[in-house]
Amino acid sequence: MGDSSELNVRRSVRDLQAEYDRGNRKPLEDLIRAWKGIQELPPDDKRSFFILGGYHGEPFDYRNAVDALPPDDIYTYWGGWCNHGNVLFPTWHRIYILKLEEALQSIVPGVTLPFWDETSEETVKKGIPDVLTREYFELDGENIKNPLYSYTLPLSLSDNVPGDNKAYEKPAGYETVRYPLSGLVGTPEARAATAKHNAKYPNPIENTQLLNKNIIAWLHGSGKDEEGPTTTDPNPKGRGVKWMYEKCLSAPNYTVFSNTTSAGQWNLDHPAKSVVALEQPHNDVHLAVGGFDIPGQGESGQVADANGDMGENNTAALDPIFFFHHCNVDRMFWLWQKQNGFINKLEVITGYYGTNSSDSQGPTPGIPPGTPLDLNTPLNPFIKDEFGNPFTSMDCINIEEQLGYTYGPGSLDEVPKPEPITGGSTKKLTVRGINRGLFDGSFVIRAYASVPDAQGQLTEYYLGDHAVLSRRNVVKCANCLTHLEVIAHFPLDTLSADLVDKAEYWITIQHRGHSKRMKVDKDTGQSEKALLAQRAELPEKLKYSISVTD
């Protein structure tokens, strides 16, 4: 497979769109035709988008390994096949999108899955490529519903979690949504709240404009100016998704590059130089598309109660944009491999955080709790041959030699060396101890510093955000409850050493079901009563620690 002339080339979707606009319509039309085809397949067809999208979370049809266990077994909760927060995150998703691409090729031979180049100049300035947000597309002389815009469920979905309030269940005919809309329709109360919220946003074109403004804000980081971070800018840009993607390419080894659990611990163990895992900017894009806004957007404002499907692991892969996003994540994985000499070999640090099936999200079907994860762990449910052997990470290290595809030109092919911020502190802020089990799904931690001047007036500095892509009811996974700690690190190099010493630090948490950002009291370690009321059945309270380290 190594001959470049035989490789399938995954191109930027924006390049396909530009080629279409210049008159060469076939590549983009073939892509649309293939996506239309897999969405129209019967829902029990293994190539159907319903089946493929469901591997990541709902509809949970393939859970025999779990359902056969006694109801009181700690392993009975299952949230899908996907791997997050562990060393299998990049490789599992590599095979996942390959299977989606193979389904597309069964409809239109030769078509490849393009990537959404999330760090390109066009994306940073304009947001999502138009073909992914256009409601209709002309194909074969007919104006059809664009299959890249959304997906309409042919069957209802259920998360099958005992005692859940079913807010994330979806009926047949449900159409996936993105920011600023809400897709919570599982209960009468949720449907009423969603109808009221979505009625505020009746215009798809204006909704896309809001979505793109949100994406751009996340890419840059907060702040109204267009400059990079400085020691005197109270709302610096430069700590957004684009910066995170650039930063992750310098991760020193596969273990910490691969996932947020390993990277979080690595930053505690190696405080002199922080790392960013590939999974972190990946999480941010999920939440940006799926309903979370970011401070400092100016006139676009902040849309409370948005609940897009991309913002929750259970439903994310049912939005077609998921696969264009993950194609870019896989491209970044390949760029890291090429730029750091790991094209043919990856290594996992045995016994490190993020190398156990119980870390972060908990185990997936067929992988018992407490199982060490390595490059030979099966990437279920994906089968590689006629003998029923599962794919492992060893089968997908070199995408050109082993899988027969490569990537066309894109941003960060030659990653720029970030210019150091002169005069800033070398310290970082560490927030830890927050339990994901307290939250119904994904949430965002945001860190701030307040510094008094000589007159006692406070200046607020926004330090950055840490997105946590999660799923509802992780607390139902009894085995996972001791593995739900979130560790977040925020560089303080936009503050001078003097300001770092004077500052008071605090965080806010934006989460589902709460329209306000809550300032969490550092002294008591407790949140506002509103959060506790949502999960009153939990005996514990939201607590965390903040520390400034060298």
From Swiss-Prot:
It is an enzyme of class 1 (oxidoreductase). GO terms for molecular function: metal ion binding; oxidoreductase activity. It catalyses: L-tyrosine + O2 = L-dopaquinone + H2O; 2 L-tyrosine + O2 = 2 L-dopa; 2 L-dopa + O2 = 2 L-dopaquinone + 2 H2O. Optimum pH is between 4.5 and 6. Exhibits a rather narrow pH range of activity (over 50% of activity between pH 4 and 7) and no detectable activity above pH 8. Transmembrane segments: none annotated. Cu cation B binds at residues 282, 286, 326. Cu cation A binds at residues 56, 84, 93. PROSITE patterns: TYROSINASE_2 (PS00498). Binds 2 copper ions per subunit. Keywords: Copper, Metal-binding, Oxidoreductase. InterPro entries: Di-copper_centre_dom_sf, Tyrosinase/Hemocyanin, Tyrosinase_Cu-bd. Coiled coil: none annotated. Copper-containing oxidase that catalyzes the conversion of L-tyrosine to L-dopa and then to L-dopaquinone. Can use various phenols such as p-coumaric acid, phenol, pyrocatechol, syringol or pyrogallol. Accepts several of the constituents of lignin and potentially participates in lignin functionalization. This is Tyrosinase HcTyr2. It comes from Hahella sp. (strain CCB-MM4).
